Amino acid sequence: MYPVDLHMHTVASTHAYSTLSDYIAEAKRKGIKLFAITDHGPDMEDAPHHWHFINMRIWPRLVDGVGILRGIEANIKNINGEIDCSGKMFDSLDLIIAGFHEPVFAPHDKETNTQAMIATIASGKVHIISHPGNPKYPVEVKAIAQAAAKHHVALEINNSSFLHSRKGSEDNCRAVAAAVRDAGGWVALGSDSHTAFTLGDFTECRKILDAVNFPEDRILNVSPQCLLAFLESRGMAPVPEFAEL
């Protein structure tokens, strides 16, 4: 099990069922040292208001030895790579994930999807691209992986893609992992939990990584220190409380 989980949703995204406190309790139970709350960006129908993300600044950094990152799963809005995260939201957030979601950006052809994803990667605003192996959004995998490595953006392997959502992702995700390996980039693992019970579950992700002999030292989740070094290299100020992790 990895001690870091980078993708989950709370009751603020109303199709999810757990609170911040629920995740903290489950993290303590499972030995998760650091996690990121990444509720859906405000352009989704049941997403929280942008004030929700701005007000994350009131959260404690550390609760009972568990570190909490303030994040968002933003929506890629168009082929220019614009996302539904802006202004003061950036000032409060540590981690920006962005991906395709049908209510905001309908599936297009491979060329258009690739253009939108690369523009998002190149924007400098995003740390991780969520579920890039979604079969509803075909992309040029090699081009995406090379762009991500160039711009120091991680591509996600999403455990939920193999269980509850985005069925048929396995082949695409193996291709993503292999392309990231060859490009010398990073992968991020996300449980994409919508309930705290699945926090830290990367069982299916591990199968994908093993299938392509993915190097362990290019997985952001291997330790809090690895993930924090990545974020700090992208401009996040060091968080003194996280020195205890």
Swiss-Prot record:
GO CC, alphabetical: cytosol
GO biological process, one term: bacterial-type flagellum-dependent swarming motility
Key words, A-Z: Hydrolase, Metal-binding, Zinc
Keyword Phosphoprotein: no
Pfam families tied to this protein: PHP
Cofactor note: Binds 3 Zn(2+) ions per subunit.
Keyword Iron: no
Residue numbers binding Zn(2+) 2: H15, H40, H194
Enzyme Commission code: 3.1.3.-
Enzyme class: hydrolase
Cofactor: Zn(2+)
NCBIfam families (alphabetical): PRK09248.1
Record's subunit section: Homotrimer.
HAMAP family the record matches: YcdX_phosphat (MF_01561)
Family: Belongs to the PHP family.
PANTHER family: PHOSPHATASE YCDX-RELATED
Protein name as annotated: Probable phosphatase YcdX
Gene source species: Salmonella heidelberg (strain SL476)
Gene: ycdX
